[in-house]
From Swiss-Prot:
Family: Belongs to the RNase Y family.
Protein name (database record): Ribonuclease Y
CDD domains: HDc (cd00077), KH-I_RNaseY (cd22431)
The HD domain, residue ranges: 333-427
GO aspect biological process, one term: mRNA catabolic process
Transmembrane segments: 1-21
SUPFAM superfamilies membership: Eukaryotic type KH-domain (KH-domain type I), HD-domain/PDEase-like
Gene name of the record: rny
Cellular component annotations (GO), alphabetically ordered: plasma membrane
């Protein structure tokens, strides 16, 4: 029992002691928590103060930066406004000056207007006086002559009618003479062939081509029924086709070398093909003309290679090709051009000048002769215009214009080289025949005079210049106007050209209508 009591007392005391110890421990924990809380609060305050300071510092930096940017923008804006004010001030000053000038001009105009008004009034008075004088003179003339104005008009018209009758009489005489020539057509044909044969000794090498045929039966097929084939051929090619009694040969005559070559090739193809009629003739001639364009291009390219001058301009190359069929005083113009090119290059090399410039100028110096029968002007000017068109220098143009004396003074040593080389090529023995050139010039001028008339599309000088065949545009010239056109052309030829004998004017107006049957 005593042990139990001791145990109970011990347990009680132990519980009391444990309770007291828990109280003491709790108090100690509370103090520790309070201290920890105070320490945490102090640390948080310190962190908050540091963060606040950083935020304030950043804010100050941002404000400072924004302030500087704002001040910079304000400064730029003020500068812009200042510049605008300066410009406005300048414009105001300019406007003031212009207004002053306008005021002066208005003042001058008003003064001129007053002056013109006074002069106009004076002129009106003068015109009135002149009209009065004219009326007085008319009355005086009527009184002296004893005729009225209507009577004078009748006399004038009567004189004009008399002149017209005289012109009609001359025309009638020409028509009668032409009828007599047609009546003796065969003899005239033989005479023209004889003239061609005589001229051939002097010009056959440049104005005629002969085609050999296997037999004379082909001549009849070439002539065609009532000569329609030969007429169609001459019409399409612009040459004279001479079919005479010379065995197994046909002669083509034309002063234009390209026409003559086209006619020769076309006739050879027609003979080889065997089909010879107007439609086929027109078809073959058209094809040969197209082939001739390619041939001229190839000839020009070969000439450029032989000359040793680089050239890629297709038009220049074609014009050089045309020079192959152009002669000057009987001398081949392409051969002359190449000779001048080679001579100019050699001379320039010896003198230490620009060799390529001299060779190119020599190549172009006579290129206008390829089109001088189509374009107005001397061949010097035409050549210079072509060079200028394709961007050549003033020095080059001067060298071209000055290669003959009397046109332009040479402005460079190279220009003298071109003139010298041209003179050497032209002056060599046997190079030229002056009478041939005079004959060709006359035919070219004859064609040129005819082409000046309105409505003329093509003109061919034929029969050694004794006939001009003219093709007109049917839209511009009607049937009634063809007679007037022929009369006007004849008058102009009589006034401007010198020629032996007579020239027959033939105007052809042709209208074609095509339709396709489907």
């Amino acid at each position: 029992m005593g042990n139990i009591t001791v145990i109970v007392i011990t347990a009680f005391v132990a519980s009391i002691v444990g309770y007291i110890l828990r109280l003491i421990y709790a108090k100690l924990n509370i103090r520790s928590v309070e201290q920890t809380s105070k320490r945490v609060i102090e640390e948080m305050k310190l962190i908050a103060e540091t963060k606040a300071k950083e935020i304030i510092l950043d804010a100050r930096l941002i404000v400072d930066r924004e302030r500087k940017e704002f001040e910079h923008k304000i400064k730029e804006r003020r500068q812009f406004i200042q510049n605008m004010e300066n410009k406005l001030n300048q414009r105001e000053e300019s406007l003031d000056r212009k207004m002053d000038a306008v005021d002066k001009k208005e003042k001058n105009l008003s003064e001129r207007e007053k002056d013109f008004s006074s002069k106009e009034h004076l002129l009106s008075v003068k015109f009135s006086e002149v009209d009065k004088v004219k009326e007085e003179q008319k009355k005086f003339l009527e009184r002296i002559s004893g005729m009225t104005r209507e009577e004078a008009k009748k006399i004038l018209i009567s004189g004009m009618e008399e002149d017209a009758k005289q012109c009609a009489a001359v025309l009638l005489q020409k028509l009668e003479q032409e009828m007599r020539e047609n009546a003796d057509k065969k003899s005239k044909e033989i005479l023209s062939i004889a003239i061609q044969r005589v001229a051939a000794d002097h010009t056959a090498d440049i104005t005629t081509s002969t085609i050999q045929i296997s037999n004379d039966e082909i001549k009849g097929r070439i002539i065609g029924r009532e000569g329609r084939n030969i007429k169609a051929f001459e019409h399409a090619t612009g040459v004279d086709l001479i079919v005479d009694d010379t065995p197994e040969s046909i002669t083509i005559s034309a002063f234009d070398g390209i026409r003559r070559q086209i006619a020769k090739i076309a006739l050879e193809r027609l003979i080889a093909d065997g089909r010879i009629h107007p439609a086929r003739i027109e078809e073959v001639v058209k094809k040969v003309k197209k082939d001739m364009e390619q041939h001229l291009k190839e000839t020009g390219e070969q000439a450029v290679i032989e000359a040793g001058v680089p050239c890629s301009n297709l038009e220049i190359i074609k014009l050089l090709g045309k020079l192959k069929y152009r002669t000057s005083y009987g001398q081949s113009q392409l051969q002359h051009t190449l000779e001048v090119t080679w001579l100019a290059g050699a001379i320039a090399g010896e003198l230490g000048l620009d060799v390529m410039f001299c060779k190119k100028a020599a190549l172009l110096h006579d290129i206008g002769k390829a089109v001088d029968h189509e374009v107005e002007g001397t061949h010097h000017q035409i050549s210079a215009n072509i060079a200028k068109k394709y961007g050549e220098s003033h020095k080059m143009i001067n060298a071209i214009l000055s290669h003959h004396e009397g046109f332009e003074v040479p402005s460079s040593p190279e220009a003298f080289v071109i003139a010298t080389a041209d003179a050497i090529s032209a002056a060599r023995p046997g190079a030229r025949k002056e009478s041939v050139e005079r004959y060709l010039k006359r035919l070219e001028k004859l064609e040129k005079v005819v082409k000046e008339f309105r409505g003329v599309s093509i003109a061919y000088a034929m029969q050694a210049g004794r006939e001009v065949r003219i093709l007109v545009e049917p839209e511009k010239i009607n049937d009634n106007q063809t007679q007037i056109l022929a009369h006007d052309i004849a008058k102009k030829i009589e006034q401007e050209l010198e020629y032996p004998g007579q020239i027959k004017i033939t105007v052809v107006r042709e209208t074609r209508v095509q339709e396709i049957a489907k």
